Design a protein with these regions (language model features):
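Non-DNA-binding regulatory cores of transcription-related proteins
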Residues: 54-110, 116
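Peptidyl-prolyl cis-trans isomerase
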Residues: 45-56, 120
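Short, intrinsically disordered low-complexity segments
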Residues: 29-31, 59, 113, 120
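A short, hydrophobic/aromatic-rich structural module that often spans a beta strand
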Residues: 111-112, 125
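N-terminal intrinsically disordered, low-complexity, charge/repeat-rich segments that act as generic
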Residues: 1-49
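Short, solvent-exposed secondary-structure boundary/capping segments
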Residues: 120-127
């Protein structure tokens, strides 16, 4: 049984313009579907274990000893773009959850080990 994804109204408002229109690549379609089915809550009500925009997360790929630190960002912000296959897979995921990241030629699972920084948890709503 899967639970309904939870995202902030602020993230929803900022992402909607990015995924509306005629884009048909997989990450955009994935985000569009997530925005359509997610429960949208005010930023202070977002659970602290949900990957939101501008979160810093530590992820691990199966079979690898080292984890990787990533910051989920809007395009052109210098981090992992939410419009990339991995960024779209991580947005809305929960700590401890494994998600499928599907790129042009490869598909692999990645696990969110922990959320090191989440703006909502820190009450940073002006991001």
């Amino acid at each position: 049984m899967t639970t309904q994804p939870i995202i902030s109204t602020l993230d929803s408002e900022r992402l909607e313009p990015l995924v509306s229109g005629s884009w048909t690549d997989a990450p955009v379609l994935r985000l569009r579907a997530l925005l359509g089915r997610a429960s949208k809550v005010a930023p202070p009500q977002v659970p602290s274990d949900v990957v939101t925009m501008n979160s810093r997360v530590r992820v691990r790929y199966p079979g690898e000893n080292e984890s990787e630190a990533l910051e989920l960002t809007f395009p052109d912000a210098g981090g992992l773009s939410v419009l990339s296959p991995l960024g779209a897979a991580l947005f809305g995921a929960r700590e401890g959850e494994s998600v499928e990241c599907t790129g042009a030629r490869v598909s692999r699972r990645v696990t969110v080990e922990r959320i090191e920084y989440q703006p909502e948890r820190e009450r940073h709503f002006d991001r």
